């Protein structure tokens, strides 16, 4: 069975309970490695009044060299160590504060995630599955990242793309955790063309639509529309480029050369993978809209995620594209209000994320 590296997220959240309650069923479809120290795991299990059997846990440690070793088998747990350059000393000796924002839990969750990311990068596992973190806890810990995807960009120096959804509807986010005031400035021909090219090459979806930025997609310039003009130009260029089968070197050159862009467009007569005009966002998520196109790109976070979560909250997952590793995540937050309360916990997104990762081919 394929191996999954699973980072525990914020230990003060529902993540650890999802992990424990799902372990037996998850182990039927993959071999999970949980990135948590035994002492901290035992504290969480005691608070939850749960037990974890036949599991593999990985204690991670900051070191200048990468090294993965089996340590011991104890109380039906297989305990491993993974040393790597983390940039921080790992402190697992802190108290769990259920449902609270805490810098120590924030830093520990980040280091669990970083260690699990490089565990996959070093080919010890097929994919990474991340449990939810709290962005404020990361900030309080002195971390500069706004979330997992932001950190992955820095780890691997790649333009990671966030995609969320399920088989009924997937949405790629052109921008993620940035203020709305900054989104319009980010929408440039160059930025959007690169994004659309990369998004297609990662997904190979056959038909995709861009959600308009302005109400009614600008309504022919009556309600703004400047962003939609840029979107139309980028769509036409990327459709023509993908059809041409030209290489990356040509793409970079054509981004700056309007004559090459015109040449591509003159030679392009077919139907592109992207619909030619931005879609009106307020009807794109209706039954008829999704029947027409259920693979979408949104210029900003809430434009896509509000309707996605209203329609498919329980089964949606988060996928990071355009990286040297496979990374998936649950599509929900820390749910501090339910943490360590034996509340009803929905594990469907967790299983959907695991199954999605298992079914993907390994990154070269």
Curated annotation (Swiss-Prot):
Quaternary structure note: Homodimer.
UniProt-listed SUPFAM superfamilies: Isocitrate/Isopropylmalate dehydrogenase-like (SSF53659)
Annotated residues for binding of substrate: 148-149, 309, 318, 327
Ligand binding (a divalent metal cation): 177, 216, 301
Lineage summary: Bacteria, Pseudomonadati, Campylobacterota, Epsilonproteobacteria, Campylobacterales
Protein's GO biological process: pyridoxal phosphate biosynthetic process; pyridoxine biosynthetic process
Catalytic activity: 4-(phosphooxy)-L-threonine + NAD(+) = 3-amino-2-oxopropyl phosphate + CO2 + NADH
Functional description taken from the UniProt entry: Catalyzes the NAD(P)-dependent oxidation of 4-(phosphooxy)-L-threonine (HTP) into 2-amino-3-oxo-4-(phosphooxy)butyric acid which spontaneously decarboxylates to form 3-amino-2-oxopropyl phosphate (AHAP).
Statement: the UniProt record of this protein carries the keyword Magnesium: yes
Keyword Nucleotide-binding: no
Other observations noted: The active site is located at the dimer interface.
Protein name as annotated: 4-hydroxythreonine-4-phosphate dehydrogenase
One Gene Ontology cellular component: cytoplasm
Subcellular localization: Cytoplasm
Family: Belongs to the PdxA family.
Keyword annotations of the record: Cobalt, Cytoplasm, Magnesium, Metal-binding, NAD, NADP, Oxidoreductase, Pyridoxine biosynthesis, Zinc
Cofactor annotation: Zn(2+); Mg(2+); Co(2+)
Enzyme Commission code: 1.1.1.262
Pathway: Cofactor biosynthesis; pyridoxine 5'-phosphate biosynthesis; pyridoxine 5'-phosphate from D-erythrose 4-phosphate: step 4/5
Alphabetized GO MF terms: 4-hydroxythreonine-4-phosphate dehydrogenase activity; cobalt ion binding; magnesium ion binding; NAD binding; zinc ion binding
